[in-house]
């Protein structure tokens, strides 16, 4: 992503190779600050407190968390301790477990003296893979947008609705749901994005920050405005991300995604999910089996932003002592999804389509579970 003319990724290794640097997303879009993570404990805090967020990025930072841990204690006990520390930070996003399992499976049979270097190399490999996957999703998704553009009068704008932030800030680079939009924009297809504010963490502000940095027209809307826009023909398609997708195609994503899918279904608006393969949980069929994270009620009862003095602060919006139900995710059944935009192409949201497209990965994942 370009910020004031300079390209950034969301995570990178420091110049001295001893730390992992991230962009503190809790300060965006008001302040751009880089934080150096120097331990597995700091990586865990960064994930838990949402300095970084988005399923793919969480996985990458967790992998680097293991590498950071190997700097301090590469013993069997240390490896397991860092795994246990990181795995409990965010229970819903499957990329976290996928990345940590990959790290521990590779490191556990190595000599202690070899683990540090291999851990850093593998974490970097996982990061590079994420960039490649997301760019491919963008290329395939841009064709979906092009097909819709071709059905409209020449020069007409394609209006796309997205929920939460599944862009560059949710991955290492490019993003998932926003990657097709970036590619379409680069290819000269006129697009406009309806950006859900996405309460309570207001990730829509992050999406607006991204799109604005790339010069892509967009409008920030209240979460409940999407259905109205669809009823009036102002949405050509929806593209969202996913934190975990089951083997049969049910999608767990940011709370409110399900309601957007229902509105899209009722108004015959195509509803696509940008799906990188590491986000598929082949061990779960029914989306109801996915653990749904419940976060601190303060996120619900307070708003975090910048005050007139230019300071970041919390503002209470509810009576003191109000009980809050802060569910972070919901599940959209596969029947409401038009298709998955993956790194290998676009497929139907069904068990058979996913199994056909990713037969090799499914087999490998299930074999790993058996061991």
Swiss-Prot record:
For the ligand (substrate), the binding residues are: 53-55, 90, 203, 253-254
Q: What keywords were assigned to this record?
A: Amino-acid biosynthesis, Isomerase, Methionine biosynthesis
Q: Which InterPro entries match?
A: IF-2B-related (IPR000649), IF-M1Pi (IPR005251), IF_2B-like_C (IPR042529), Initiation_fac_2B_a/b/d (IPR011559), M1Pi_N (IPR027363), NagB/RpiA_transferase-like (IPR037171)
Q: Sorted alphabetically, which Gene3D superfamilies does this protein's record hold?
A: translation initiation factor eif-2b, domain 1, Translation initiation factor eif-2b, domain 2
Q: Which reaction does it catalyse?
A: 5-(methylsulfanyl)-alpha-D-ribose 1-phosphate = 5-(methylsulfanyl)-D-ribulose 1-phosphate; 5-deoxy-alpha-D-ribose 1-phosphate = 5-deoxy-D-ribulose 1-phosphate
Point out the signal peptide segment: none
Q: Which GO terms describe its molecular function?
A: S-methyl-5-thioribose-1-phosphate isomerase activity
Pathway linked to the protein: Amino-acid biosynthesis; L-methionine biosynthesis via salvage pathway; L-methionine from S-methyl-5-thio-alpha-D-ribose 1-phosphate: step 1/6
The catalytic site is made up of 243 (proton donor)
In Pfam terms, one family for this protein is IF-2B
Q: Does the keyword Isomerase apply?
A: yes
Under which EC number(s) is this enzyme classified? 5.3.1.23
Which effects follow disruption of this gene?
Answer: Inactivation of the gene precludes growth of the strain with 5-deoxyribose.
Q: Where is this site: Transition state stabilizer?
A: 164
Say which enzyme class the record assigns.
Answer: isomerase
- Which SUPFAM superfamilies does its entry note? NagB/RpiA/CoA transferase-like
Q: Name one GO biological process term.
A: L-methionine salvage from methylthioadenosine
Stated role: Catalyzes the interconversion of methylthioribose-1-phosphate (MTR-1-P) into methylthioribulose-1-phosphate (MTRu-1-P). Also catalyzes the interconversion of 5-deoxyribose 1-phosphate and 5-deoxyribulose 1-phosphate. Part of a bifunctional DHAP-shunt salvage pathway for SAM by-products.
- Protein family membership: Belongs to the eIF-2B alpha/beta/delta subunits family. MtnA subfamily.
**What PANTHER family does its record include?**
METHYLTHIORIBOSE-1-PHOSPHATE ISOMERASE
**Name recorded for this polypeptide:** Methylthioribose-1-phosphate isomerase
